[in-house]
Amino acid sequence: MLKFEHVTKTYKGGKKAVNDLTLNIDKGEFVCFIGPSGCGKTTTMKMINRLIEPTEGKIFINDKDIMAEDPVKLRRSIGYVIQQIGLMPHMTIRENIVLVPKLLKWSEEKKQERAKELIKLVDLPEEFLDRYPYELSGGQQQRIGVLRALAAEQNLILMDEPFGALDPITRDSLQEEFKNLQKELGKTIIFVTHDMDEAIKLADRIVIMKDGEIVQFDTPDEILRNPANSFVEDFIGKDRLIEAKPDVTQVAQIMNTNPVSITADKSLQAAITVMKEKRVDTLLVVDEGNVLKGFIDVEQIDLNRRTATSVMDIIEKNVFYVYEDTLLRDTVQRILKRGYKYIPVVDKDKRLVGIVTRASLVDIVYDSIWGTLEDATENQEEQADSKTTEPEMKQEG
């Protein structure tokens, strides 16, 4: 799908932003480029659509040399999402989504159908198509930015820190949605980020760069288990190496399959009764098809008990969730580092299937850390033994 052959970018003064880069990226693969500031990751991405042109070497897309392509046509054939989102403020959401199809002279009917089809992919109502960007939240705007990159059915999408400006909860939700969307559509994604957690969560393979060169190009698991050198170890952070058992990889393997839930039409009194019976302070709210809709907690009930009568009156719809095939290490990061008490687990249709709590992770993290300490102790004992036996061997000689 995408191939770099000995690509170098040299700026005036002789500084090499990218130096002799060679790699192959397969069709449908999600590849993250990461490294410290000035490592060449953004320059590498911008050479793909010729916003920056290479000084030496060749880049091929589907075996075609991009330097032989018309740069305007090339860019229209590649999706591009940036951190600033870049929606046109004077255009409706519909007009923003079909901007590239319009440039490609699609029929009006085809453009309208494409806009309706795409808005459904990110669970936004169709009436949003007639709104303007300022009427949407930051997370909703970024969803539209992603849709615009998909609108002309581009197979290759470039993404330059697209979620970097969002708050942590919105960012987590969008990452989860986008990874699921990428799996469903089979697009090839080149994703630049400075966040190792984001790269580990999203990527099929990660390119770690330093000083314009590739230090390691491998799967997240392989990088975590076998970092190429001390730079990679320091960059990814040693704490990530012990946050989960290697043999427990997906949320579904450790989740509680009986989360306490309630439907939105129930009364607050019914909700309080369930909380007392189950000894919980939070209830997940689902519809009749068990699709996750939000949550309520005792604090909300207490604050609204004089005015609200039903669960629907106080439901908090902004709930973070993960899919059942989400890698466990990503969930560990969120619960332990970002302060989540629990995370609901859903299937591909967003039906509630389980819940992961801090308590359910205790054994996993304990075993990981304890195992690491045991290994370290064994190594120290072996070294001590070798030092003890070494002089004895000399005495025998």
Curated annotation (Swiss-Prot):
InterPro entries: AAA+_ATPase, ABC_transporter-like_ATP-bd, ABC_transporter-like_CS, CBS_dom, CBS_dom_sf, Gly-betaine_transp_ATP-bd, P-loop_NTPase. GO terms for biological process: glycine betaine transport. This is Carnitine transport ATP-binding protein OpuCA. GO terms for molecular function: ABC-type quaternary ammonium compound transporting activity; ATP binding; ATP hydrolysis activity. Disruption phenotype: Mutants are impaired for growth at high osmolarity in brain heart infusion broth, fail to grow in a defined medium and show no detectable carnitine uptake. Residues 2-236 form the ABC transporter domain. Residues 255-311, 315-373 form the CBS domain. The keyword Translocase applies. It catalyses: a quaternary ammonium(out) + ATP + H2O = a quaternary ammonium(in) + ADP + phosphate + H(+). One of its GO terms (cellular component) is membrane. Pfam families: ABC_tran, CBS. Keywords: ATP-binding, CBS domain, Nucleotide-binding, Repeat, Stress response, Translocase, Transport. Its EC number is 7.6.2.9. The keyword ATP-binding applies. Part of the ABC transporter complex OpuCABCD involved in carnitine uptake. Probably responsible for energy coupling to the transport system. Involved, with BetL and GbuABC, in osmoprotection and cryoprotection of Listeria. SMART domains: AAA (SM00382), CBS (SM00116). The complex is composed of two ATP-binding proteins (OpuCA), two transmembrane proteins (OpuCB and OpuCD) and a solute-binding protein (OpuCC). Belongs to the ABC transporter superfamily. Residues 384-397 have a biased composition (Basic and acidic residues). Residues 377-397 are annotated as: Disordered. The lineage of its organism: Bacteria, Bacillati, Bacillota, Bacilli, Bacillales.
